[in-house]
Amino acid sequence: MAQAQYAGTGRRKNAVARVRLVPGTGKITVNKKDVEEYIPHADLRLIINQPFAVTSTEGSYDVFVNVVGGGYAGQSGAIRHGIARALLQVDPDFRDSLKRAGLLTRDARMVERKKPGLKKARKASQFSKR
């Protein structure tokens, strides 16, 4: 019999993460690399583990992630969102705790576009009265 798999898609900024959860030992693989190798910042790795901490399922599932787009922070947020959605498939009772922790909400903040005549989205050249 095939092993149970749970899937979830997470998004944050320009990053999209496709996440698969398989019952296992808690190993996280991102783009065929270990998470410590792929994401060098420890604080971003903590973000990835938040859904497991909230639902008390640390070490229960192996995580396989395929993530594209964005940087480390956006990808970490997308992975967290995908794991939270996949955990909902594992047990729908997790919805309340995940929702209360804000892990099911898609973070809608995006980079503001650059405006013509300005140097960046809001940075203008210095104003001279005379």
Swiss-Prot record:
GO molecular function, one example? structural constituent of ribosome
Q: Which gene underlies this protein?
A: rpsI
Task: Enumerate the PANTHER family for this protein.
Answer: RIBOSOMAL PROTEIN S9, SMALL RIBOSOMAL SUBUNIT PROTEIN US9M
Signal peptide limits = none
Q: Name one GO cellular component term.
A: cytosolic small ribosomal subunit
The record's family statement is:
Belongs to the universal ribosomal protein uS9 family.
**Top-level taxon of origin:** Bacteria
Q: Does the keyword Glycoprotein apply?
A: no
Tell me what this protein is called. Small ribosomal subunit protein uS9
Instruction: Return one Gene Ontology term, BP aspect.
Output: translation
The record, for InterPro entries, names: Ribosomal_Su5_D2-typ_SF (IPR020568), Ribosomal_uS9 (IPR000754), Ribosomal_uS9_bac/plastid (IPR023035), Ribosomal_uS9_CS (IPR020574), Ribsml_uS5_D2-typ_fold_subgr (IPR014721)
- HAMAP family cross-referenced by the UniProt entry: Ribosomal_uS9_B
Q: Which UniProt keywords apply?
A: Ribonucleoprotein, Ribosomal protein
